[in-house]
Amino acid sequence: MAGLFGSKKDTRPIDVGLASLVGSDEPTAIEFWKKRFEMTAAVPNDIARVGALTPQMRELTRIDNLEERKRLTRARLIAFTKLAPEQRQLITAARRKAFDVDRGVMEADQKLVDELLPTLDASVRSAYPQA
């Protein structure tokens, strides 16, 4: 039996801002992620920071084109290193806690991070937290 609204899958983006980045240039994507991280770090509650970060990770995993997902993840990794150290700490803590919220999404993201990180500049690699 279909649900109240039928069995059609909802294909609307979870995060419209992130979805709009598909096809953008790298500087635009990096600036987007930097701004998003700054806003997330500014959230005054750790649980709310996790709640802000998790949908962004979900939206990334919904991008079917693997090369585009890699490109946006790469931009995210670069943007992370442009944050102030205290902002990086807050984002890192939220990301760790997000594994308890949606382990499948976060593990898929971590797999991509593990693949991309070695290809990035040493300054990016050294600033990104290792598990």
Region spans (language model):
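General marker for long, soluble alpha-helical cores
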Residues: 4, 10-78, 82, 86-131
